[in-house]
């Protein structure tokens, strides 16, 4: 008995005893793995926006073919967000449980297929508006899981000191994708018709899915994930995160409010800027206003991540850096949006639009990373909650934008709406935003 007791009293060997932080370290990507995945996720985000922006680029041509007015075009444009807002939390939860990379791959394969088949749906009988709206809702449902799953993946696999640059690099794919569809898509639109733009973006997405599946993912892990989804079973033990405690924190609501404002203002500009330039400057080249703002936004996004990590490494408080990024991403960008509604010069409009879109990319190094600061153990879920709020606001914002244009005939009201929404979110984050973790479960040692 003494020998048994003494053996039971022996400390657990250090190599077999792992703290949560040590277990998290085991899941981190190595430098080569991080570089490879960053490149592939950058491309994935690019294709996400290629398919998302296809409809705004083609709206004018499709409206002419099918006889849609501004309100009907607004319904089609906003229908994406009807689906998008429903799967944010699900995407984050699944990313936390089965792995964000698997969620991303499965959803991309489905939205790529739907994008390719959208022109076919549009010509099914006389209900073209209903069929196109339905396809956009499905696309929104499938793309809604992407960023929550991405946030979950990066919070688990990337070192904290590198998250801002990694996230801003991957986030730059949104501008690259918009740029690709705006440039190549505009050429295809003029030469081959609007259907070719859908075939182009959807086909590239399916090729990306094949490459990631073939070379980066373990087939057994993907099959296991599919089995888990089919059975509806959790992969890991139930979460012990104190949700009631989490949502009592003002900092959590501040980041949700700021994400809502950021997403809403971005979606309004994303959806309506092509139509604004097409109608205000009808003799301008489509590829110019569909390319230049997003082209300049790419280095802006990379710079925001670089300067954010640099400031933190030099000793500036994390929350100070996050708030500075939001002043640029919501405050300064809204000023240029206001200017956009008070000029009749094409050149000035291009400058203001480029500046507004460019400064919005600073949000990648602000609130997007602040969610990982607050709750790295459930970052996907929390981002899903925040982006659900943003998507719902996007539905209202895009529809309201179409209504304002139709009833007032003025684009100034739309840009005023962007400025109001942006500054409400900025003010909330500046007052209540923090960077301390709020997902830690109190232990006896803490009492």
From Swiss-Prot:
<dbReference type="GO" id="GO:0001409">
    <property type="term" value="F:guanine nucleotide transmembrane transporter activity"/>
</dbReference>
<feature type="transmembrane region" description="Helical">
    <location>
        <begin position="413"/>
        <end position="433"/>
    </location>
</feature>
<feature type="transmembrane region" description="Helical">
    <location>
        <begin position="197"/>
        <end position="217"/>
    </location>
</feature>
<dbReference type="InterPro" id="IPR005829">
    <property type="entry name" value="Sugar_transporter_CS"/>
</dbReference>
<feature type="transmembrane region" description="Helical">
    <location>
        <begin position="74"/>
        <end position="94"/>
    </location>
</feature>
<dbReference type="GO" id="GO:0141013">
    <property type="term" value="P:purine nucleotide import into lysosome"/>
</dbReference>
<dbReference type="GO" id="GO:0015867">
    <property type="term" value="P:ATP transport"/>
</dbReference>
<dbReference type="Pfam" id="PF07690">
    <property type="entry name" value="MFS_1"/>
</dbReference>
<dbReference type="GO" id="GO:0030141">
    <property type="term" value="C:secretory granule"/>
</dbReference>
<dbReference type="InterPro" id="IPR036259">
    <property type="entry name" value="MFS_trans_sf"/>
</dbReference>
<dbReference type="GO" id="GO:0005765">
    <property type="term" value="C:lysosomal membrane"/>
</dbReference>
<keyword id="KW-0968">Cytoplasmic vesicle</keyword>
<dbReference type="GO" id="GO:1903790">
    <property type="term" value="P:guanine nucleotide transmembrane transport"/>
</dbReference>
<feature type="transmembrane region" description="Helical">
    <location>
        <begin position="380"/>
        <end position="400"/>
    </location>
</feature>
<feature type="region of interest" description="Disordered">
    <location>
        <begin position="1"/>
        <end position="26"/>
    </location>
</feature>
<dbReference type="GO" id="GO:1904669">
    <property type="term" value="P:ATP export"/>
</dbReference>
<dbReference type="GO" id="GO:0015866">
    <property type="term" value="P:ADP transport"/>
</dbReference>
<feature type="compositionally biased region" description="Basic and acidic residues">
    <location>
        <begin position="14"/>
        <end position="26"/>
    </location>
</feature>
<keyword id="KW-0812">Transmembrane</keyword>
<feature type="transmembrane region" description="Helical">
    <location>
        <begin position="287"/>
        <end position="307"/>
    </location>
</feature>
<comment type="similarity">
    <text>Belongs to the major facilitator superfamily. Sodium/anion cotransporter family.</text>
</comment>
<dbReference type="InterPro" id="IPR011701">
    <property type="entry name" value="MFS"/>
</dbReference>
<dbReference type="GO" id="GO:1905146">
    <property type="term" value="P:lysosomal protein catabolic process"/>
</dbReference>
<dbReference type="InterPro" id="IPR044777">
    <property type="entry name" value="SLC17A9-like"/>
</dbReference>
<dbReference type="GO" id="GO:0042584">
    <property type="term" value="C:chromaffin granule membrane"/>
</dbReference>
<feature type="transmembrane region" description="Helical">
    <location>
        <begin position="103"/>
        <end position="123"/>
    </location>
</feature>
<dbReference type="GO" id="GO:0098594">
    <property type="term" value="C:mucin granule"/>
</dbReference>
<feature type="transmembrane region" description="Helical">
    <location>
        <begin position="36"/>
        <end position="58"/>
    </location>
</feature>
<protein>
    <recommendedName>
        <fullName>Voltage-gated purine nucleotide uniporter SLC17A9</fullName>
    </recommendedName>
</protein>
<dbReference type="GO" id="GO:0030658">
    <property type="term" value="C:transport vesicle membrane"/>
</dbReference>
<feature type="transmembrane region" description="Helical">
    <location>
        <begin position="169"/>
        <end position="189"/>
    </location>
</feature>
<keyword id="KW-0813">Transport</keyword>
<dbReference type="InterPro" id="IPR020846">
    <property type="entry name" value="MFS_dom"/>
</dbReference>
<dbReference type="InterPro" id="IPR050382">
    <property type="entry name" value="MFS_Na/Anion_cotransporter"/>
</dbReference>
<feature type="transmembrane region" description="Helical">
    <location>
        <begin position="327"/>
        <end position="347"/>
    </location>
</feature>
<keyword id="KW-0472">Membrane</keyword>
<keyword id="KW-0458">Lysosome</keyword>
<feature type="transmembrane region" description="Helical">
    <location>
        <begin position="252"/>
        <end position="272"/>
    </location>
</feature>
<feature type="transmembrane region" description="Helical">
    <location>
        <begin position="129"/>
        <end position="149"/>
    </location>
</feature>
<dbReference type="GO" id="GO:0015217">
    <property type="term" value="F:ADP transmembrane transporter activity"/>
</dbReference>
<keyword id="KW-1133">Transmembrane helix</keyword>
<dbReference type="GO" id="GO:0160042">
    <property type="term" value="F:purine nucleotide uniporter activity"/>
</dbReference>
């Amino acid at each position: 008995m003494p020998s048994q007791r003494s053996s039971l009293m022996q400390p657990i060997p250090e190599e077999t005893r792992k703290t949560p932080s040590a277990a998290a370290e085991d899941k981190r990507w190595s430098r080569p793995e991080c570089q490879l995945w960053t490149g592939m996720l950058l491309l994935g985000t690019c294709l996400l926006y290629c398919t998302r922006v296809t409809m705004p680029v083609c709206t004018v041509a499709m409206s002419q073919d099918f006889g849609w007015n501004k309100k009907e075009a607004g319904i089609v444009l906003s229908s994406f967000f009807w689906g998008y807002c429903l799967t944010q939390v699900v995407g984050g939860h699944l990313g936390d449980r089965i792995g964000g990379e698997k969620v991303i791959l499965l959803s991309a394969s489905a939205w790529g297929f739907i994008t390719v088949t959208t022109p076919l749906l549009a010509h099914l009988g006389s209900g073209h508006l209903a069929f196109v709206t339905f396809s956009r809702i499905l696309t929104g449902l499938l793309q809604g899981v992407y960023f929550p799953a991405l946030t979950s993946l990066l919070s688990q696999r990337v070192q904290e000191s590198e998250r801002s640059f990694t996230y801003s690099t991957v986030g730059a794919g949104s501008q690259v994708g918009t740029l690709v569809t705006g440039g190549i898509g505009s050429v295809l639109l003029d030469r081959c018709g609007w259907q070719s733009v859908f075939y182009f973006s959807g086909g590239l997405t399916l090729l990306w899915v094949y490459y990631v599946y073939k070379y980066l993912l373990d087939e057994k892990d993907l099959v296991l994930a599919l089995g888990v989804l089919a059975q509806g079973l959790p992969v890991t033990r139930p979460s012990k995160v104190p949700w009631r405690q989490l949502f009592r924190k003002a900092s959590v609501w501040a980041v949700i409010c700021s994400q809502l404002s950021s997403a809403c203002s971005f979606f309004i500009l994303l959806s309506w800027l092509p139509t604004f330039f097409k109608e205000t400057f009808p003799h301008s080249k489509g590829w110019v206003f569909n390319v230049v703002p997003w082209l300049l936004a790419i280095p802006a996004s990379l710079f925001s991540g670089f300067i954010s990590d640099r400031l933190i490494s030099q000793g500036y408080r994390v929350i100070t850096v996050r708030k500075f990024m939001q002043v640029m991403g919501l405050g300064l960008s809204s000023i240029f949006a206001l200017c956009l509604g008070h000029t009749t010069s094409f050149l000035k409009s291009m400058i203001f639009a480029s500046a507004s879109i460019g400064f919005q990319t600073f949000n990648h190094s602000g609130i997007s990373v602040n969610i990982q600061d607050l709750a790295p153990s459930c970052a996907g879920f929390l981002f899903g909650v925040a982006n659900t709020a943003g998507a719902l606001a996007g539905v209202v914002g895009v529809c309201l934008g179409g209504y304002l244009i139709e009833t007032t005939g003025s684009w100034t009201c739309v840009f005023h709406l962007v400025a109001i929404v942006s500054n409400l979110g900025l003010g909330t984050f500046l007052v209540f935003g923090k960077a301390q973790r709020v997902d830690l479960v109190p232990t006896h040692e803490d009492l």
